[in-house]
From Swiss-Prot:
It comes from the Bacteria. This is N-succinylglutamate 5-semialdehyde dehydrogenase. The lineage of its organism: Bacteria, Pseudomonadati, Pseudomonadota, Gammaproteobacteria, Enterobacterales. Its EC number is 1.2.1.71. The gene is astD. Pfam families: Aldedh. GO terms for molecular function: aldehyde dehydrogenase [NAD(P)+] activity; succinylglutamate-semialdehyde dehydrogenase activity. Belongs to the aldehyde dehydrogenase family. AstD subfamily.
Length: 492
């Protein structure tokens, strides 16, 4: 029984699904997808639970969420292992995901009050008030790269605001999704407030097609996000929050400490085996001897990165990708770039057949025409050379995406110029692109999405503002507008 609907664990009526560790092949989870009827059942449960949940005081909803935070803390070790085994990422990195999940809850509580709480301004004849109200029933689509942390960034603010939810985790991480839902159950969440439907494309399409849905919160690929946007077009009554990918540029200008710059680049491009939406996909490197030295050092250090299993000791920097198919797709993308005329500096290697272990790849594309503006979601870094900083900014902005952008340079003036001209939601200076804080907006523009699914800014799309003019008594104004006559005379 792997679906959680209206407080009950039930068996899916859709296709069967098996999840294996992407490196060892160990079977981790087995179950069945939710069919369209069960998706509808989850929606009805959420709709029925909404009035009571929304009418609870904020303190009562907060108490449930804080109990969930306590359960995360107490079950940190077990949940870390589940996420690591299912995604293939090393234990050390899965542990950082749990820490982020826990920390985000307190930030979400504060954000509710600061960004979407209640405000009152006194007026001579009354008051002007601002309140926020929940949308109703929201669908949350989770990604596979951070199957606990990223859905949590939607779910917690949505619940705090008073919404009820239907959650569909990625079909590649059903075990993590189920494990987190069982903690919500232990936290005492009332039946129907949060519902879990497992499944792939068919389940997702049934969920997004629900008429009685008030909104959809999505983190994932641009292709899926575009499909959802088209599906919900013409329905302005539904909130749609999209956080998608990026073809992110990292500008390497003047470098004083080459090893520090190489470390920043590896953290930007290859952490999580390149499976972060903010990962650097393009290095824009200033032409010259210093750029040559940086590139040689980057290749030398990157070729030492050997992916391993989640529990290897000593721990590897990167693990496997989410699946063997995902690793093969990245490898094929490198082959296609090479066939277009790219110059391979570090060839990626599929280490073992039947696994997702893939070493990083680096390929220079300077002067190659027609390179696709696509996100390759894995450890593949493309390099272009530039001559002037203005050219670097033009190259950085030459993408339909707009998620993250970074600059390595000692010159504050160049960063100030980049801040003015960059088309990206995240612009960093001498910091990895993959660093993020839950107190800052996380998201981008263009094909990278619209709203900002972090603990702080998620409050904005989880509730709608209600403005009120109020007075505890009704009196006739002392001065009336022209043309109004309230005298006792009878007009003949």
């Amino acid at each position: 029984m792997t679906l959680w609907i209206n407080g009950d664990w039930i068996t899916g009526q859709g296709a069967s699904r098996v999840k294996r560790n992407p490196v060892s092949g160990e079977v981790l989870w087995q179950g069945n997808d939710a069919d369209a009827a069960q998706v509808g059942q989850a929606c009805r449960a959420a709709r029925a639970a909404f009035p009571r949940w929304a009418r609870l005081s904020f303190a009562e909803r907060q108490a449930v969420v804080e109990r969930f935070a306590g359960l995360l803390e107490r079950n940190k070790g077990e949940l870390t292992a589940i996420i690591a085994r299912e995604t293939g990422k090393p234990r050390w990195e899965a542990a950082t995901e749990l820490t982020a999940m826990i920390n985000k809850i307190a930030i979400s509580i504060k954000a509710y009050h600061v960004r979407t709480g209640e405000q009152r301004s006194e007026m001579p004849d009354g008051a002007a008030s601002l309140r926020h109200r929940p949308h109703g029933v929201l669908a949350v689509f989770g990604p596979y790269n951070f199957p606990g942390h990223l859905p949590n960034g939607h779910i917690v603010p949505a619940l705090l605001a008073g919404n009820t939810i239907i959650f569909k985790p990625s079909e590649l991480t059903p075990w993590s999704g189920e494990a987190v839902m069982r903690l919500w159950q232990q936290a005492g969440l009332p039946p129907g407030v949060l519902n879990l439907v497992q499944g792939g494309c068919e389940t997702g399409q049934a969920l997004s097609a629900l008429e009685d849905l008030d909104g959809l919160l999505f983190t994932g690929s641009a292709n899926t996000g575009y499909q959802l946007h088209r599906q919900l077009s013409g329905q302005p009554e539904k909130i749609l929050a999209l956080e998608m990918g990026g073809n992110n540029p990292l500008i390497i200008d003047e470098v004083a400490d080459i090893d520090a710059a190489v470390h920043l680049t590896i953290q930007s491009a290859f952490v999580t085996a390149g499976q972060r939406c903010t990962c650097a996909r393009r290095v824009l490197l200033k032409s010259g001897a210093q750029g040559d030295a940086f590139l040689a050092r980057l290749v030398a250090v990157s070729q030492r990165l050997t992916p391993g299993n989640w529990d290897d000791e000593p721990q590897p920097f990167i693990g496997g990708l989410i699946s063997e198919q995902a690793a093969q797709q990245v490898f094929t993308a490198w082959q296609q770039l090479e066939a277009m005329g790219g110059r391979t500096l570090l060839a990626p290697r599929l280490l073992q057949a039947g696994t997702s272990l893939l070493t990083p790849g680096i390929i220079e594309m300077t002067g190659v025409a027609g390179v696709p503006d696509e996100e390759v979601f894995g450890p593949l870094l493309r390099v272009w050379r530039y001559d002037s900083f203005e050219e670097a900014i033009r190259m950085a902005n030459n993408t339909r995406f707009g998620l993250s952008c970074g600059l390595v340079s000692p010159e504050r003036e160049k960063f100030d110029q980049l801040l003015l001209e960059a088309r990206a939601g995240i612009v960093n200076w001498n910091k990895p692109l993959t660093g993020a804080a839950s107190t800052a907006p996380f998201g981008g523009i263009g094909a990278s999405g619209n709203h900002r699914p972090s603990a702080w800014y998620a409050a904005d799309y989880c509730a709608w503002p209600m403005a009120s003019l109020e007075s505890d008594s009704l009196t006739l104004p002392a001065t009336l507008n022209p043309g109004l006559d309230f005298s006792d005379e009878v007009v003949r």
